[in-house]
Swiss-Prot record:
Its cofactor is pyridoxal 5'-phosphate. The gene is hxB. PANTHER family: MITOCHONDRIAL AMIDOXIME REDUCING COMPONENT 1 (PTHR14237:SF19), MOLYBDOPTERIN COFACTOR SULFURASE MOSC (PTHR14237). One of its GO terms (biological process) is Mo-molybdopterin cofactor biosynthetic process. Pathway: Cofactor biosynthesis; molybdopterin biosynthesis. This is Molybdenum cofactor sulfurase. The modification N6-(pyridoxal phosphate)lysine is found at residue 239. Residues 643-820 form the MOSC domain.
Length: 822
């Protein structure tokens, strides 16, 4: 493709739209205020006027079940017929040549085709698919009894097509491919369908299935030439319009013969059926009538009418959307490709097919990439996505349900992926880098309503947080001579978190608090579980959990709980009670440690009063559960640095986390370790960094954060009058162990605490904000991990005395802390 001039390319920006895209956004997409949405390949967004139009339609008309004969039912049937025709015309599909079957989504359309082929022949069918296929296309191979093949390159497909003319196989064959990769936007040749049809004209048993879900989101699908069109086209309307949640299967009527062999039939698809005696039925005559099982989602179909009208009014045509998004995608791609660190190392590794050049036939508005630091090390995709989320930038990371494209882009082989799976890699987890290679890919995708500000915001985000503009020699610990001074630390505060992810109970001054091998007494002994899934709730997903505040009343033997400003109070006995046992997972998705994703047995409180107390406050069906005493405790696994050990510390260096011991300490419902420690001096230094962290002129000034956002059990502080007011932030990074109190209780340091965006939840308001995570990313990134605080546990030597006799261990606010430096 010849290069276009800058003026000519700029003319593509929102050309043909009813108004400037910024004006459309302000009026039609109020939820985009202060938000950068770059996940249009997941779903594009619905305009306000679409919802208003649909609401008017529903409130002005009475729509009945289309299978009835009443006037309301006939109205529904009439509207469905009209909208079916309108949808076909949207894709330039002649209703004499094509029929459209309404389904739930593109995956449902694919499954419907596969079901048809499964029943088409006693011999079964053969299935071929392209490497860029979505998981839903790959899954069809499991039903292909005559075998299957994954085509790795376009050349392989072309050679297979060339051989069809001499192929005498007489069983049905189906070739499926995506019109556009949902991973990187690579577009496959549309002419394959015609080539396959022409090449197999003698046999007439080779069919094509086009997954158009990603393609149609920003590009016109032209089916005007029925001879060149796919036999089956699967798509989702929400990818185009944002709403309704509805899909379609477009079928060439010349392929209707194989459809008639489908065995299953549902309500509304037959003219008559005998329920007893002879198993006989007569299917309806049209393609859509015999494939649309049961009552159609007629309200969603009616909403499609409003979607088509609104989209046309705002954007004119899909060609306009295509030009607009192509301009933006090329602009963003070029900016990311040009980014370099101070030493010339590229910041972004872009995964774009060599065959793609942002021509409409080869590339869609999707950019797939990963980020490297100045030394070439990969930045974890999860960290980037978490930080983007904090900055209100919506992107996606992972394999994107496109395992073939991801593996090919990253250079993973099948055996290597199986080894990764055995090592714990799962879809959606935080295993970002294994064997020195990324396990997933970052993706930004553009849509009709994307604008230049979206591009600029994302480019600024990468520039601010991931471009190293000069060599950094950040002193993470004080100079050597300061480290060697006689330390003078004390316990400033003790916090117990009885309910996982909820508020803290502050241990009163002057009260000694029992500490066990699994942590402070009563810490993380309870959790809230979803009554439907059994998964433990997390503040990451439900920030209002921070406002659930427990108080441990040892005198009365109860846990008193309040929620926000509500005066209602719930009391739960500290004594063990018999409750229903349920199995639950600590997180809904697997994490890099062995904590989140563990299946643990907890005792769920069966009282409706308990369940409603928490459910009403959080707005989610949940109840309280407790870690039972008879069940073995879990094993801690704190995040560890990958640095080699170095006993002799140089100024400005960061020490190796202690090597794992042969026996890891147990934990209850804590995420990674029995006890978490932070220092007041480190919090103060972080707040100084937050204050002086450069910010865009339009952003609000950042506020200092409280130590409570880090949810530490122990906060240590320094006696500054003994040190001439010389605070030593992050000196705890050098600690190998420490002792506390008059009895010199010994604690082992297990490693550094890796941080996520949970620290952005204000513990007093339950609201999310950017800090401190945004500043931590800049100042506390160690080996591509954002760390703050230290995981600790009571030393094994403190757990018994004499002949295995239990030893009582306690700590108190004000106790002296004596560290042992690594």
């Amino acid at each position: 493709m010849q290069a276009k001039s800058k003026t000519e390319s700029r003319a593509e920006y929102c050309t043909g739209y009813s108004e400037d895209v910024d004006v459309i956004r302000e009026r039609e997409y109020p939820f985009l205020k202060d938000t950068t949405y770059l996940d249009h390949a997941g779903t594009t967004l619905y305009p306000k006027s679409l919802i208003d139009s649909f609401a008017r339609d529903l409130t002005s008309n009475l729509f009945g079940n289309p299978h009835s004969r009443s006037s309301s039912s006939q109205l529904s049937t009439q509207r469905i017929d009209d909208i079916r025709l309108r949808a076909l015309r949207f894709f330039n599909a002649d209703p004499d040549e094509f029929d459209l079957v309404f389904v739930a989504n593109a995956t449902a359309a694919i499954k419907l085709v596969v079901d048809v082929f499964r029943d088409s022949s006693p011999q079964g069918f053969w299935y071929g698919y392209f490497i860029d296929a979505h998981t839903s296309l790959v899954g069809a191979r499991e039903i292909a009894e005559r075998g299957h093949r994954c085509f790795l390159t376009s050349g392989e497909v072309e050679r297979w097509i060339a051989d069809l003319a001499t192929d005498q196989k007489n069983f049905p064959r189906l070739f499926a491919y995506p019109g556009q990769s949902n991973l990187n936007g690579r577009r496959s040749p549309m002419q394959w369908c015609k080539k396959i049809r022409d090449g197999s004209s003698g046999a007439g048993n080779v069919y094509t299935l086009l997954d158009a879900a990603s393609l149609v989101s920003t590009s016109p699908l032209d089916l005007s030439d029925a001879s060149a069109a796919p036999d089956f086209t699967a798509l989702s309307f929400y990818k185009i319009f944002g709403f309704p949640d509805l899909g379609a299967l477009i079928v060439r009527k010349s392929a209707a013969g194989i459809i008639k062999k489908r065995k299953f039939f549902g309500g509304g698809t037959v003219d008559m059926v005998l329920a007893q005696g002879m198993p006989w039925h007569a299917k309806k005559s049209t393609i859509h009538e015999c494939l649309e099982d049961g009552t159609l989602p007629f309200h969603n179909i009616i909403a499609l009418d409003s979607a088509l009208s609104t989209h046309g009014r705002l954007f004119g045509s899909m060609s306009n959307v295509s030009f607009h998004t192509r301009y933006l995608a090329k602009r963003l791609h070029n900016r990311l490709a040009a980014m370099t660190h101070f030493n010339g190392q590229k910041v972004c590794h872009l995964y774009m097919s060599p065959e793609s050049d942002f021509d409409n036939s080869t590339q869609g508005p999707i950019i797939a990439f990963n980020i490297r630091n100045s030394s070439g090390a990969w930045i974890g995709k999860s960290e980037v996505e978490r930080l983007a989320n904090v900055k209100k930038i919506h992107i996606r990371s992972g394999s994107h349900c496109n395992s073939g494209g991801t593996a090919t882009s990253l250079g993973w082989t099948g055996p290597e992926l199986l080894r990764n799976f055995s090592a714990g890699l799962r879809c959606g987890d935080d295993h970002d880098v294994m064997d020195g290679r990324p396990t997933g890919i970052l993706r930004v995708s553009l849509g009709a309503v994307s604008n230049l500000r979206d591009i600029d915001a994302f480019a600024r985000f990468i520039d601010e947080f991931y471009i190293e503009k000069e060599p950094e020699f950040v002193s993470l610990v004080p100079p050597m001579e300061v480290v060697l001074q006689e330390p003078s630390f004390y316990v400033e505060s003790l916090s117990v978190y009885p309910i996982k992810s909820c508020g803290a109970f502050k241990v009163p001054d002057g009260q000694r608090w029992e500490i066990k091998r699994e942590g402070l007494a009563w810490d993380r002994e309870w959790c809230l579980i979803h009554q439907g899934t059994g998964a433990a709730l997390s503040m990451k997903k439900y920030p209002r959990m921070a406002l659930i505040r427990p108080v441990i009343d040892l005198e009365r033997g109860v846990l008193r709980i309040t929620c926000g400003s509500d005066s209602k109070e719930l009391e739960v006995s500290l004594r063990r009670e018999i409750t229903n046992l349920v199995t639950t997972s600590l997180c809904q998705s697997a994490k890099s440690s062995n904590v989140c994703g563990d299946r643990v047995v907890v005792q769920a409180y069966s009282s409706p009063t308990v369940a409603s107390f928490f459910s009403n406050f959080l707005g989610v069906p949940c109840t309280l559960a407790r870690f039972p005493p008879q069940i073995s405790t879990r094993i801690s696994n704190p995040t560890r640095s990958s640095r080699r050990s170095q006993r002799a510390l140089m100024p400005g260096s960061f020490p190796e986390d202690p090597s794992p011991t042969s026996e890891q300490p147990p934990i209850l419902l804590s995420n990674e370790s029995p006890i978490l420690l932070i220092s007041r001096s480190s919090v103060n230094r972080l707040n100084e960094n937050i204050k002086y962290n450069p910010r865009p002129s339009y952003s609000t000034p950042a506020k200092a954060v409280e130590a409570d956002v880090f949810r530490a059990n122990i906060v240590v502080a320094e006696n500054l009058h003994q040190l001439a007011n010389a605070e030593r932030p992050y000196i705890e990074d050098t600690w190998e162990s420490f002792s506390v109190g008059p009895e010199q209780l010994c604690f082992d340091v297990l490693g550094s605490c890796q941080r996520c965006q949970m620290v952005c939840v204000d513990p007093y308001t339950g609201t999310r904000r950017e800090e401190p995570y945004s500043t931590l990313v800049k100042t506390r990134k160690i080996n591509s991990k954002i760390v703050f605080g230290r995981h600790t546990s009571l030393s094994n030597m403190e757990l018994s005395q004499g002949a295995g006799k239990p030893k009582s261990c306690t700590v108190m606010v004000g106790d002296v802390v004596t560290p042992q430096i690594a």
